[in-house]
From Swiss-Prot:
Cofactor(s) needed for function: Mg(2+)
Keyword Phosphoprotein tagged: no
Keyword Metal-binding: yes
Gene Ontology cellular component annotations, sorted alphabetically: cytosol
Originating species: Cupriavidus pinatubonensis (strain JMP 134 / LMG 1197)
Protein name (Swiss-Prot/TrEMBL): Probable GTP-binding protein EngB
Binding sites annotated in the UniProt record for GTP: 31-38, 58-62, 82-85, 149-152, 183-190
């Protein structure tokens, strides 16, 4: 069983000064307000109500932390970080400014951040705001793994095209970097439970969870991103 299944809520943060003062690794989840981010987090952690999604897209404007650790462990060994969804037009200007600043500052400056899970609707990958998120994060030299969510909405050929185009975009970003960084992508469907184990392997590897260390002799570190 994945240790992610034992994730539990830790804290909510509205300012960078309130981020947990810990040294444990973090994996952040980012995406547009309607990309299915909260649902995907719940599925990956095998829980129904770990991450809450507002009925009104764009309402959640805080950073939510979830601790990853065995149930009786006194301290977390890692964190999952649910970032505010972006791109919803009805958010007020002042709230949007604060929100964008919180997002950009966190992904660019948080030293504990080990990697970014970027969720995009498979029907509309790489919107302008998705590109902005990638461009904020790339200079950190840390990996990005794209989950093309709602893959159940597309045919097999449409999914193949979306994945191919996403990987091509990521290759373009990789060419801009002086030092190679893993920029990978996969198809994902919460409804059909597609791609769950692959995404869990990526996250476990970034967080150095015991399950990833146990699997290391059998598979190479780059394998999780190599889905077809």
């Amino acid at each position: 069983m994945s240790l992610l299944h034992q994730a539990r809520f830790f804290t909510t943060v509205n300012h960078l000064r309130d981020l947990p003062a810990t040294a444990v690794p973090e994996v952040a989840f980012a995406g547009r307000s309607n990309a299915g981010k909260s649902t995907a987090i719940n599925i990956l952690c095998n829980q129904k109500r770990l991450a809450f999604s507002s009925r009104t897209p764009g309402r959640t404007q805080h950073i939510n932390y979830f601790t990853v650790a065995p149930v009786k462990a006194p301290d977390p060994i890692a964190f999952l970080v649910d970032l505010p969804g972006y791109g919803y037009a009805e958010v007020s200007g002042s709230a949007k400014y604060h929100w964008q600043g919180l997002l950009s500052d966190y992904v660019q400056t948080r030293s504990q951040l080990s990697g970014l899970i970027l969720m995009m609707d498979a029907r509309r990958p790489f919107t302008d705001l998705d590109c902005q998120m990638v461009e904020w994060f790339l200079p950190t030299g840390k990996p990005v793994h794209v989950l093309l969510t709602k893959a159940d909405k597309l045919t097999n050929s449409e999914n193949a095209k979306a994945l191919r185009e996403t990987r091509k975009m990521l290759e373009g970003y990789a060419e801009q970097l002086a030092t190679p960084v893993p920029l990978t992508a996969q198809l994902f469907s919460s409804l059909k439970r597609r791609g769950i184990e692959e995404a869990q392997r990526v996250i476990a590897g970034w967080l150095s969870l015991p399950e990833a260390q146990a699997a290391a002799p059998a598979e190479q570190p780059a394998a999780p991103g190599a889905s077809e």
